[in-house]
Amino acid sequence: MQALVNKIWYQGHPLRWLLLPLSALFAFITAFRRSLFRLGIKSQTTLPVPVIVVGNITVGGSGKTPTVIYLIELLRNQGFNPGVISRGYGAQFQGVKVVTVKDAATDVGDEPAMIVARTGVPMVVGAKRVETAKALLTQFAVDVIICDDGLQHYALGRDIELVVIDGKRGLGNRNLLPAGPLREGEWRLNQVDFVIVNGGPAVANQYEMQLRPCAVLPVSPAVTAEFDSTQPLVAMAGIGHPARFFETLTQQGYQVALSHSFDDHQAYDKRQLCELAASRPLMMTEKDAVKCRDFAQENWWYLAVDAKLSPQFDQQLLSRLRSVAAAKKGKSHGV
């Protein structure tokens, strides 16, 4: 099914035309929903600290999670104390939940588990963004909230919006769901503060981002050996765009004997992956690794990547953030 969807969205498959009436209905529903907030019929909650939303206007992986990790590290280096909220897609909990390094990905979601494992950032997950953000502020002394995904969740007031675009797949056929991959029209890019292009050329008023491999690490915390890069390996990925991961491995010179794609947010078990690896080294993404660490074998590895953005982006974002923070601080003191 996913292969057919990709053909419709990115390769001009004629079934797109049959889906266009449904896309028109989707456009009407989303426009109506936005108008409720614009007209004040539905309220938007403003928080006392700056809120940065990192999202996209397409379905599927675009690089939001590495962007969030980049922002966490950037803000910390500048003296901020950021916290993160997320939906926790596929997680098994009710209400809101604080994410810890001990939490399984099945309990809090793949991306939250990965973000906290990498950074240790204060993080709360929940279906309702406003409720989740308030819980974060109640339980942690954060001065900036980063919302991982949630561009279309207008009930949460935001001060800075970042959209991440896949530089290779772009916006596909530029149709709204289900005929195309768009959650909102291309016009939305003109309203956000920053457009980040992941792994592709950026045009005017956009910022290019590269995901650069930084280490090959064992999935199991108990393993102390280093990876032997001369061995042929089996590659697997359960992310929004697995082909990008496989291409990265090839570009890094690894001998990929077999590659296998899983669905995004796939749940794994030990026997399934042992059969796939067949005693060969198994290489996966960092997002997959957080789901496998409890039953990982000695020859299972993951490729850690770091996002790289320009100093110009850093400067523009920090300038905007400091301006927002000062204004909110002034209001809290009655200035």
Swiss-Prot record:
This protein's UniProt keywords: ATP-binding, Kinase, Lipid A biosynthesis, Lipid biosynthesis, Lipid metabolism, Nucleotide-binding, Transferase
Enzyme class: transferase
Keyword Lipid metabolism: yes
GO molecular function: ATP binding; tetraacyldisaccharide 4'-kinase activity
Binding-site residues, ATP: T58, V59, G60, G61, S62, G63, K64, T65
Annotated Gene Ontology cellular component terms: plasma membrane
Record EC number: 2.7.1.130
InterPro entries given in the database record: LpxK, P-loop_NTPase
A GO BP annotation: lipid A biosynthetic process
Pathway: Glycolipid biosynthesis; lipid IV(A) biosynthesis; lipid IV(A) from (3R)-3-hydroxytetradecanoyl-[acyl-carrier-protein] and UDP-N-acetyl-alpha-D-glucosamine: step 6/6
One Pfam family named in its UniProt record: LpxK
Reactions the enzyme catalyzes: a lipid A disaccharide + ATP = a lipid IVA + ADP + H(+)
Parts forming coiled coils: none
Stated family: Belongs to the LpxK family.
Xref: HAMAP family: LpxK
Stated role: Transfers the gamma-phosphate of ATP to the 4'-position of a tetraacyldisaccharide 1-phosphate intermediate (termed DS-1-P) to form tetraacyldisaccharide 1,4'-bis-phosphate (lipid IVA).
PANTHER family, A to Z: TETRAACYLDISACCHARIDE 4'-KINASE (PTHR42724), TETRAACYLDISACCHARIDE 4'-KINASE, MITOCHONDRIAL-RELATED (PTHR42724:SF1)
Protein name (Swiss-Prot/TrEMBL): Tetraacyldisaccharide 4'-kinase
Protein's organism: Shewanella oneidensis (strain ATCC 700550 / JCM 31522 / CIP 106686 / LMG 19005 / NCIMB 14063 / MR-1)
